[in-house]
Amino acid sequence: MDGEEVAALVIDNGSGMCKAGFAGDDAPRAVFPSLVGRPRHQGIMVGMGQKDSYVGDEAQSKRGILTLRYPIEHGIVSNWDDMEKIWHHTFYNELRVAPEEHPVLLTEAPMNPKSNREKMTQIMFETFNVPAFYVSIQAVLSLYSSGRTTGIVLDSGDGVTHVVPIYAGFSLPHGILRIDLAGRDLTNHLSKILSERGYSFTTSAEREIVRDIKERLCYVALDFEQEMQTSSQSSAIEKSYELPDGQVITIGNERFRAPEALFRPADLGLEAAGIDQTTFNSIMKCDMDVRKELYGNIVMSGGTTMFPGIAERMQKEITALAPSSMKVKIIAPPERKYSVWIGGSILASLSTFQQMWISKQEYDESGPSIVHHKCF
C-alpha cells in the first residue's frame, strides 16, 4: 500500500436498488436490486448447487421459485442479516474487492435513527474490517452532484421520499420533511388499478413485472383532469405491453393515474401532502432570507423522479404556490437516478475530505457512537 492511492468504495443502499462503485468514477460500476431471495420449495435435484439465498440480479432472475424480500423499507434498514448479505455480495461478487483494503462511504436516509447509523458502522468495522468509514446523507450528496451547495432536494426513490433544504452545504433539519410514499407504493397502486382492468399480479415475482410496466410506460400529466378527459375520448395514449408469457396487455389512463399519487397521496388513502405541497411546506419552514435561493434551486433526485413530465408539473404547481414575483427553477439532471452515488463519488475523492474518515483506530477507541461525532 506504500504511497499508492487506494480508491474509496462508495455504496448507496437504496430501498430498491443498490448502487456501488469506486470514488472518482463518474457512474456506479454495479447497480442491482436490493433484494434477497430464498427458495420457496425444497431443492430435490442433487448436484444443482442450490443455495439457501440469492442476492440482487440472481434473485431477480430466479424469482419464479423464490420469495423475495427487500431488507430496506422506507429508506431504513429493517433486516440486518439480509443487509449484511447484500453488502457481502457488493464487495465480493459485484466490485470484487477486499473490503479490508478500502475506505467505505455509505449513504443514509435523512432522519435515519441513531441506532441504525451505529449498527451500520459496527458491521463495517467488525464484520468487514474496513480501514476507514463514513456515512453521508443521501440528499446532500445529490446536491453536491448537481454542483451546488445551496438548494432544496426532492429525493424520491423506491421506499421513501424526502424534501431536504440545504444551505451552504448543511442540511436544515427543521425543514426536512418525509413522505412515506415512493416508487414501491406507485408500483402497488399501479397493480391495483390494473386489476380493475382484469389483470392480476399477486406474487412478489409478478410485482416486479408491474414495476417494469411502470418504468417503461408511466408519465406525469401536466393537467390531470384535462388528461383524464382527453383519454376518455381518444385512445391515443394507449400502449401495449408484452408479459413474460407472451400475453399482450393494453394500458391507457393507468399510465398517468399511477404517478399522479405523488401529487395526490389521498389516491393511496394516505393523509399526506403531495410532493409539490411538501416542497413548498419545507421552504416555508426555513428562514425568510434563504427561501429565494431555495425556490431557485429545486433539485430532483432518485428513480421515482424519472417520470416524463414530472419537472414541468412540479414547475407549474410550485409556481402556483409561491409568491407571484418569485423565480422558481426545477433542476432535473438526466443522471438523477444515480445522483446520490455520483455525489458520494465526488465527496470521497476530495482531498479535503480525507481527514473526515472515521479510522479503524478511532472506532476501536470510541465504539460505534463515534459516527455521531464525525459524520453529520
From Swiss-Prot:
Q: By its UniProt entry, which Pfam families does this protein fall under?
A: Actin
Enzyme class name: hydrolase
The UniProt record lists the EC number as: 3.6.4.-
Q: Which InterPro entries match?
A: Actin, Actin/actin-like_CS, Actin_CS, ATPase_NBD
Recorded catalytic activity of this chain's protein? ATP + H2O = ADP + phosphate + H(+)
Say yes or no: keyword Metal-binding present: no
Similarity comment text for this entry: Belongs to the actin family.
By what name is this protein known? Actin
Q: Which organism is it from?
A: Candida dubliniensis (strain CD36 / ATCC MYA-646 / CBS 7987 / NCPF 3949 / NRRL Y-17841) (Yeast)
Point out the gene that encodes the protein.
ACT1
